[in-house]
Structure formats: C-alpha cells, structure tokens
Amino acid sequence: MKNIHFDINKYEAHVDLEYLKENGRVEKISDGVIFSSGLENAALHQAVTIDGRHRGVILELNEEFVGIGLIDKTNDILEGMSVSVTDHFIEVNLFEDMAGRIIDTTGKMLYDVSDEQPTASSPLFCVTPAIMTIDSVTRPLNTGLAVIDSITPIGRGQRQLILGNRQSGKTQIAVDTIINQHNQNVHCIYVAIGLKAAYIAEVIETLRKHGAMDYSTVVATAASDSLTAQYLTPYAGMAVAEALRDQGKDVLIIFDDLTKHADAYRAITLLFNRPPGREAYPGDSFYIHSSLLERAVQMNQDHGGGSITAIPMIETLSDDVTAYIPTNVISITDGQLFLKSDLFNRGQKPAVDVGVSVSRIGGDAQHPIIRKLSKNLTLILSQYEELKELLDFGNALDDGSMKMVTDGRMLTELFKQNILSPLSVTELITILYAFQNGFLTKMAPANVQSFKGLLLEKAHAHQKFEEFSNQIEEISELNESHVKMLEEIIQEAGRPFS
C-alpha cells in the first residue's frame, strides 16, 4: 500500500477557549427559545444578549447546549449570530417612586414616553428570607368584602389563593381589595400574566378611575408577548415587592393568574425537550410556584418590619380543585378562597364557597371585634347548605332547623355585595352586629339588601359613627356607648321594614 504522509498542521485552526467561556453562537431557534453553543461560564437566570441587541435569559443548562429564552418577541434572530453573557442575572429596573407605574418584566415603562431613568434594580430570582428574620402574621389586610373579612380573613404577610372557573369573579375580588387599600398604607402590585391587552387596560382604567393607581404598580405581559416574558412576569412583580418591603412598607401583590404562568413554563420546558410529567407539566412545577410565593412574608422589626401579602389566582376547569396546579398552589399557600360558578350564576357575589374556603392564619390577624362577631358564621352557612337540600325536596323541618335555614338565608343575603363597593371595618361591624343580635330575624330576605344600604346610610349620618371609625384600631371590644350607638342606627334603619 502506498504510504501517505498526513500533515495535520495545515488543518490546524486557532480556537480561543477563553472567548468561548463568555460567548457563543446561535445553533438553533425554536418558538421563542434558542439553543446556543459555547457560554461555558453561563449560569442559570443570567442575562444574555444576542447579536448585541436582543435580550435573553438562560433557562436551561446541559452538556450539549445552553437554552436561552427570548424576552422580546422577534423574528430577527438567525442561526450563527453571536451570544454573550452579561455580568448580571436577570433583574427588573426600579424608579424612585413606583406608584402609578406600568412596567414590563424588565422594568421598562409601558404606555409612557417619558425619558425618566431607573434609580435601582432588583433581581428576579433570590432566596427566601431566613426564618429568623420572619415574624408572625398579626395585622389584618382588609379586602372590604364582608364574606372574606369575617369568615376567611387575610393578614399582612399571608399567602391566600383565589381559585375558580373562568368568569367566576376572581379578578373582581382582587380589584376590590386593591381599591380598599386606600389610606391603609399598603402599596399594591397587580401582576398580569399572559392576559389580553384589552383586559389589562380595562383593569388599569378601573384602578385609575377609583384613585388606586396613586398607590399601585402594574407589572404586565400580554398574551401576545413572548413565553419567556410571561414566565418571568410574576418574579418581576415579586422583585418590585421585595424592594418596597425592604423599605419597611406593607405590600399587596396580586398574581393574575398562575395557571397561565404554569402553561408558559410548560411550553418552554417542552421546547427544551425536558421530559413531561403529570398533565405534561415538568417535574419542577411545584418549585417554580413555591419559590415565588415563599418570598411573601412578614419581616420582623429588626429587618424593617415590612410585609408582602400574596394573592395568587388559579383558574379551574369545571370547579375541579384536584388538578395538578390547583393542588400544588393550595399546598403552598396559607389558605384559599374557592369561587363556585353555581353560586356566581345564582347571583351570590362574591361567589365564595365557604365550605371549601379556609384561612389558616388570618384569624390571628383579624380585628378582635370582627373575630367575636364572626365566630359561628361558618357553621350557620354550612348548616344552611345542608338543610336547603332537604327543603328542595319538600321535606318538613322542625322549628330549630327552620331557624337555621332563616339565619343562613339572611346571612347569605347580607354577604352579597356589589362590585367596587368595599366595606370599612366599622361598616362590617355594624352589619354583623345587626345579624348576631337578631335584628334581621323577622325581615323578609328580599328586603335585606335594601336594609343593608339604609343601615350604612344611617350609620354615616350618626354623629358618633365617625369618631367610632377613627378609634377602631385602638378598640378591642364594644363598650356600652358603642352598643347604644349601633342599636340606635340599626333600629332607625329597620323601621321601614318592620
């Protein structure tokens, strides 16, 4: 065989290994995610730039490639383009005053053409506060909704889930809660995840119309935005909340909703060829929500005393709370409000199913007077639901059972509440006092709503009610003068219905 001299030197090409540690190239593009070679020093959640102008974040690391999610939706990225890691992890820009801001995942202002520059930034992903820095939940966060504040109260620093079918009133509860924080020294953050742009604009307009944007921030991504932006949005909202919490402020953050967040994450992981699990969600679906919601805490005084109260929302299908994502978030949070479509369609708004709803720690933060007036309300409603089924079949009930039915029917009517009409603490006390002391016993259920409206009108007209409202935070029980005032108001309001 003829000898062949093979000179490998002529094929030698210089490879800059140092360059490949911080740089790479686009090898593949797939529906908003890219696969890059190189980037040996890359870290999870590190910010990158593609071709020096497109923003991305590292979401996947393996031996073959680095998976990058594109923050901006674009068709301008091509295979072979350069990819470079930055010197920071993904973060959201902050402004000196966050009230009234509408921002995207990275803190870029939306619907605002001003050239104001950010003054700081906050990382989207960080560790949960150490347990020694956390305090107990002892202060109430009033929603202004009678059924919630009395039966399933929420405390500052709590995580309370709202779940229910589409069009069952989840967002309306959140909006009412934000509006009720007026003059309560609570900064509100509404996080819209993958919603229609028109729907987001409608919520913002409602908040602005009621003056709530004066103490609120909106972090939003629309359904038309990239999957990565939708996935990162709740973390951006939490990063803003943490920056405010570190200033000693109380923050309320609404996630609308985490079902769409889980869907966006599922799509991203499937694009990265991760093995699907239950309902095709990846195995770390629990982690993405627990790592987010566990950042909502009440800090102790040594660490500023600020708090983050988180109200995530989950959309159910056919009132099924046993699906994968609902059960995950139920186990992460400190309680849940289950909104039932059947109640909503019957006109019971807010449509809270008291039998399934619970607040595990909110009772410790409830106002002591409301706690005392609310102690047996859950039992009354539960008995009413049981006995009502017997009445539907025409069964005769004894006097004791009929009283339970009457009380339950009255309480159900009292808990009906028009949208955008939150109740103050003293208004709720007045309503509950009227119920608990038998002033509604002989009233027709059809008159309860009219009576409630007149009751609140008479309360605000009473000369001592304003003083009672101003002192309510310092009052732990009703004295004789308070009782006399409440009974005068209730008797005057009840005269037209006697």
From Swiss-Prot:
Its main location: membrane. One of its GO terms (cellular component) is plasma membrane. The keyword Ribosomal protein does not apply. Gene3D superfamilies: 2.40.30.20, ATP synthase alpha/beta chain, C-terminal domain, P-loop containing nucleotide triphosphate hydrolases. It catalyses: ATP + H2O + 4 H(+)(in) = ADP + phosphate + 5 H(+)(out). Keywords: ATP synthesis, ATP-binding, Cell membrane, CF(1), Hydrogen ion transport, Ion transport, Membrane, Nucleotide-binding, Translocase, Transport. The record marks 357 as: Required for activity. Coiled coil: none annotated. The keyword Nucleotide-binding applies. It is found in: Cell membrane. It is an enzyme of class 7 (translocase). SUPFAM superfamilies: C-terminal domain of alpha and beta subunits of F1 ATP synthase (SSF47917), N-terminal domain of alpha and beta subunits of F1 ATP synthase (SSF50615), P-loop containing nucleoside triphosphate hydrolases (SSF52540). PROSITE patterns: ATPASE_ALPHA_BETA. It comes from the Bacteria. Its EC number is 7.1.2.2. One of its GO terms (molecular function) is ATP binding. It is a peripheral membrane protein. F-type ATPases have 2 components, CF(1) - the catalytic core - and CF(0) - the membrane proton channel. CF(1) has five subunits: alpha(3), beta(3), gamma(1), delta(1), epsilon(1). CF(0) has three main subunits: a(1), b(2) and c(9-12). The alpha and beta chains form an alternating ring which encloses part of the gamma chain. CF(1) is attached to CF(0) by a central stalk formed by the gamma and epsilon chains, while a peripheral stalk is formed by the delta and b chains. Produces ATP from ADP in the presence of a proton gradient across the membrane. The alpha chain is a regulatory subunit. HAMAP family: ATP_synth_alpha_bact. Belongs to the ATPase alpha/beta chains family. This is ATP synthase subunit alpha 1. It comes from Listeria innocua serovar 6a (strain ATCC BAA-680 / CLIP 11262). The lineage of its organism: Bacteria, Bacillati, Bacillota, Bacilli, Bacillales. The gene is atpA1.
